[in-house]
From Swiss-Prot:
Site (Autoinhibitory): residue numbering on this chain: 97
Alphabetical UniProt keywords: Acetylation, ATP-binding, Cytoplasm, Cytoskeleton, Kinase, Magnesium, Metal-binding, Nucleotide-binding, Nucleus, Phosphoprotein, Serine/threonine-protein kinase, Transferase
Family: Belongs to the protein kinase superfamily. NEK Ser/Thr protein kinase family. NIMA subfamily.
EC nos: 2.7.11.34
Ways its activity is controlled: Binding to NEK9 stimulates its activity by releasing the autoinhibitory function of Tyr-97.
Phosphoserine: residues carrying this PTM: 5, 195
Record protein name field: Serine/threonine-protein kinase Nek7
Annotated region described as NTE motif, given as residue ranges: 20-33
Effect of loss of the gene: Mutant mice are viable but are born at sub-Mendelian ratios. They further suffer from severe growth retardation, infertility, abnormal gait and slight paralysis of the limbs. In an experimental autoimmune encephalitis (EAE) model, mutant mice exhibited reduced disease severity relative to wild-type mice, as well as reduced recruitment of lymphocytes, monocytes/microglia, and NK cells to the spinal cord.
Protein source organism: Mus musculus (Mouse)
Subunit and interaction comment: Monomer. Interacts with NEK9; interaction takes place during mitosis; it relieves NEK7 autoinhibition and prevents interaction with NLRP3. Interacts with ANKS3; this interaction alters the subcellular distribution of NEK7 by preventing its nuclear translocation. Interacts (via N-terminus) with NLRP3 (via LRR repeat domain); the interaction is required for the formation of the complex NLRP3:PYCARD, oligomerization of PYCARD and activation of CASP1.
Entry text on domains: Displays an autoinhibited conformation: Tyr-97 side chain points into the active site, interacts with the activation loop, and blocks the alphaC helix. The autoinhibitory conformation is released upon binding with NEK9. The NTE (N-terminal extension) motif is a structural component of the catalytic domain and thus contributes to activity.
Catalytic reaction(s) noted: L-seryl-[protein] + ATP = O-phospho-L-seryl-[protein] + ADP + H(+); L-threonyl-[protein] + ATP = O-phospho-L-threonyl-[protein] + ADP + H(+)
Length: 302
């Protein structure tokens, strides 16, 4: 459910202005208590609006999902159960899930507003300037991302959709990992219809073989993201590439090496062990986080 916020900064939305009486007893659990201001993003299955709570003035992101059209009853129940899990996460580098409720035949999810750019925008900026991201900057952001994922995995929650567009960076340089992958709850028929939207460069070999997603699949995506921060493109990116040739490249771990004259052996080695076709041979998040902390400490002073 990636959110494409670029080009979505439209005029203020008026048709969603609450007309119902305020319900202080309901808190964040009803649309009546929100003023919706403008659309800020759109995903395959959802639209995201900037809104503010009329009870406390807090700005939020309100994600509206067409839940009844896109899910069967079991998937709806599983999705809501998963969101309840996400609400238990509490970490400075994870977008906070405040509330979720079904109203007007839609699933409404109230999230912390990430009023910031994202990592994909930062990568595009460096690419446009024909400059590589300094290694100390890579570790500054990557260590925060590892901290977020360590928190999630310690609570047995997988992200499932780690990629630069889902990593937000605030004006003060704080990383916020957002848009946790709830897409698996949508019907296979619906998902198939959307499978050509965006090339799945971060898809792990086990996903290709439909062997299911596990915690080590998040590590694969994390390795791809670290590579992309250094190379300014996905490890498996190729011009005019179809899905078949992409899957072949992923299965064979066929990607160009990072420049050794610009990035440390430690960074290149970490990428290599994360992007391993065998999930069992990939490290866990605790190991990746330890390396990131050590490298952040020794590059921050340079």
């Amino acid at each position: 459910m990636d959110e494409q916020s670029q080009g979505m900064q439209g005029p203020p939305v008026t048709q969603f202005q609450p007309q119902k009486a305020l319900r202080p007893d309901m808190g964040y659990n009803t649309l009546a208590n929100f003023r919706i201001e403008k659309k800020i993003g759109r995903g395959q299955f959802s639209e995201v609006y900037r809104a503010s709570c009329l009870l406390d003035g807090v700005p939020v992101a309100l994600k509206k999902v067409q839940i009844f059209d896109l899910m069967d009853a079991k998937a709806r129940a599983d999705c809501i159960k998963e969101i309840d899990l996400l609400k238990q996460l509490n970490h400075p580098n994870v977008i906070k899930y405040y509330a979720s409720f079904i109203e007007d035949n839609e699933l409404n999810i109230v999230l912390e507003l990430a009023d910031a750019g994202d990592l994909s925008r930062m990568i595009k900026h460096f690419k446009k300037q024909k400059r590589l991201i300094p290694e100390r900057t890579v570790w500054k952001y990557f260590v925060q991302l590892c901290s977020a994922l360590d928190h999630m995995h310690s609570r047995r929650v997988m992200h499932r959709d780690i990629k630069p567009a889902n990593v937000f960076i605030t004006a003060t340089g704080v990383v916020k990992l957002g848009d946790l992958g709830l897409g698996r709850f949508f019907s296979s028929k619906t998902t198939a219809a959307h499978s050509l939207v965006g090339t799945p460069y971060y898809m792990s070999p086990e996903r290709i073989h439909e062997n299911g997603y596990n915690f080590k699949s998040d590590i694969w995506s994390l390795g791809c993201l670290l590579y992309e921060m250094a190379a300014l493109q996905s490890p498996f990116y190729g011009d005019k590439m179809n899905l078949y040739s992409l899957c072949k490249k992923i299965e064979q771990c066929d990607y160009p090496p990072l420049p050794s004259d610009h990035y440390s052996e430690e960074l290149r080695q970490l990428v290599n062990i994360c992007i391993n076709p065998d999930p069992e041979k990939r490290p866990d998040i605790a190991y990746v986080y330890d390396v990131a902390k050590r490298m952040h400490a020794c590059t921050a002073s340079t």
